[in-house]
Curated annotation (Swiss-Prot):
The gene is rplA. It comes from the Bacteria. The lineage of its organism: Bacteria, Bacillati, Cyanobacteriota, Cyanophyceae, Synechococcales. NCBIfam families: rplA_bact. Part of the 50S ribosomal subunit. Keywords: Repressor, Ribonucleoprotein, Ribosomal protein, RNA-binding, rRNA-binding, Translation regulation, tRNA-binding. Binds directly to 23S rRNA. The L1 stalk is quite mobile in the ribosome, and is involved in E site tRNA release. Protein L1 is also a translational repressor protein, it controls the translation of the L11 operon by binding to its mRNA. Pfam families: Ribosomal_L1. InterPro entries: Ribosom_uL1_bac-type (IPR005878), Ribosomal_uL1 (IPR002143), Ribosomal_uL1-like (IPR023674), Ribosomal_uL1/biogenesis (IPR028364), Ribosomal_uL1_3-a/b-sand (IPR016095), Ribosomal_uL1_CS (IPR023673). GO terms for cellular component: large ribosomal subunit. This is Large ribosomal subunit protein uL1. GO terms for molecular function: rRNA binding; structural constituent of ribosome; tRNA binding. SUPFAM superfamilies: Ribosomal protein L1.
Length: 235
């Protein structure tokens, strides 16, 4: 087993073996974000679902009110006058057959892919390349749309797509260590409400198994989910 650095050992010593109140957990994670860069703050949610069943799958979007603190490179597959609309709205890449071809060759210098419905038959052929990376456009996620300007604006402002993995775990970044504790709490609360609102119809028993938050280089801290759910929306 690899030996832990003194920094990590010291940070781990600050985290008690217990469940923390939401704001307390956020403050501790911020305190432990001691790397020389602005660490990303992430939430890891274990849900009581089995995604191999279609009625227990979770895939949706969340619009974080305080944003993510990260720039998002957006590519758009469309054609005609929509190409100009995409570029004007702020897409880093916009193309039709040429972009489809370059993606097929593995050239993917973007974080999010949006497509207009008329291009989806061609985009669908890229499933083998896009699927494993979670980049395949999907109507439920708002990444298949004719309103490109609105979609690009929303994703640039902090809208995120997320899904439960095969183990029923959701991984979502919800801010930066430089954010205030209140801003991070507002984002985390919004994420919790989104997960509850989109509970799969086939979910049985206890829905929330656990919620941990962590920074890029710091230890994870368990959050009291019930306490988070009890926070008023205007907190």
């Amino acid at each position: 087993m690899p030996k832990l650095s003194k920094r990590i050992t010291g940070l781990l010593a600050k985290v008690e073996d217990r469940v923390y109140q939401p704001i307390e957990a956020i403050q501790l994670v911020k305190e432990n974000a001691t790397a020389k860069f602005d660490e990303t703050i992430e939430a890891h949610v274990r849900l009581g679902i089995d995604p191999k069943y279609t009625d227990q799958q979770l895939r949706t979007t969340v619009a974080l009110p305080q944003g993510t603190g990260q720039s998002v490179r957006i590519a758009v597959i469309t054609r005609g006058e929509k190409l100009a609309e995409a570029k004007t709205a702020g897409a880093e890449l916009a193309g039709d057959d040429d972009l489809v071809e370059s993606i097929g060759k593995g050239q993917m210098d973007f974080d999010l892919l949006i497509a207009t419905p008329d291009m989806m038959p061609k985009v669908a052929k890229l499933g083998r390349v896009l699927g494993p990376r979670g980049l395949m456009p999907n109507p439920k996620a708002g990444t298949v749309t004719t309103d490109l300007a609105a979609a690009i604006k929303e994703f640039k402002a902090g809208k995120l797509e997320f899904r439960a993995d095969r183990a029923g775990i959701v991984h979502v970044r919800f801010g930066k260590a430089s954010f205030s504790a209140d801003a991070l709490l507002e984002n985390l609360k919004t994420l919790q409400e989104t997960i509850d609102r989109n509970k799969p119809s086939g979910a049985k028993g206890r829905y929330w198994k656990s919620l941990y938050i962590t920074s890029t280089m710091g230890p994870s801290v368990e959050v009291d989910v019930t306490a988070l759910q009890d926070i008023e929306e205007d907190a």
